Amino acid sequence: PPLPEEAMRGKVYLVGAGPGDPELLTLKAYSLLKEAPVVLYDRLVDERVLALTPGEKVYVGKEEGESEKQEEIHRLLLRHARAHPFVVRLKGGDPMVFGRGGEEVLFLLRHGVPVEVVPGVTSLLASGLPLTHRGLAHGFAAVSGVLEGGGYPDLRPFARVPTLVVLMGVGRRVWIAKELLRLGRNPREPTLFVERASTPKERRVLAALEEVAEGKVEVRPPALWILGEVVRVFAEKEAPVDALALGG
């Protein structure tokens, strides 16, 4: 049930922290972080972004194997919204792209708490590569490598997408690559992994899809994985891979 009127005080801002580089924050995100009395932040938020806020910082990130349950995050948001004029809920990338932002918005609205979404630069764009390119890739799709409860995604809808971006798929890269090959993607299709995009620790790894399927590629999370001909043109031919970094 909605909270009593008198219990409501604060507004919750669901803010995208971008892929890492603090200079990729929106002006609104920067302003809110500078003024926020409390910031509830996720695991993948860059420490340089957190350093911008003088307010209280509450970690609510989800580590593999152990995590704050989403319900507990909801309770914390309600508690802080009651206690402060406003609250920043800070998520890596964009809060509405694989960030469970929609769940938090619905929960807060159901409980009578006003919410505003402040978009961030999604990590889908953090490679600096074009996901679409005239005459080469007329569309793209993004898929999570891990579903709720640790399930595996159905990759059939993505078999023929010109550019495919995989998030949270590093630990399952061999399975994903094998499944995409089984579904008909080109074994020699170029792919690019970008570890810790837009940060000083960024690392890029180029590999054919079949090489990934054979377990020949060493990558550490968090990493973005891009598959498609845009990788061949922009990362192999026309520009050095390192020249395409986004921020840093």
Locations of regions flagged by a protein language model:
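A contiguous loop/helix-start segment that scaffolds small-molecule binding in enzyme catalytic cores
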Residues: 4, 8-12, 82-87, 137-139, ...
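Short hydrophobic/aromatic-enriched beta-strand-loop microsegments
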Residues: 56-62, 112-116, 132-138, 184-193
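Class I S-adenosyl-L-methionine
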Residues: 3-22, 27-118, 213, 223
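Class I SAM-dependent methyltransferase SAM-binding "motif I" and its flanking Rossmann-like core
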Residues: 94-161, 203-206
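Short gly/pro/ser/thr-enriched loop/turn and capping motifs at secondary-structure boundaries
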Residues: 46-48, 65-67, 122-126, 149, ...
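Hydrophobic packing residues within well-ordered alpha-helices of enzyme cores
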Residues: 49-50, 108, 127-128, 176, ...
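A broad, low-specificity signal for short, low-complexity segments enriched in glycine/proline
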Residues: 1-4, 19-21, 48, 124-131, ...
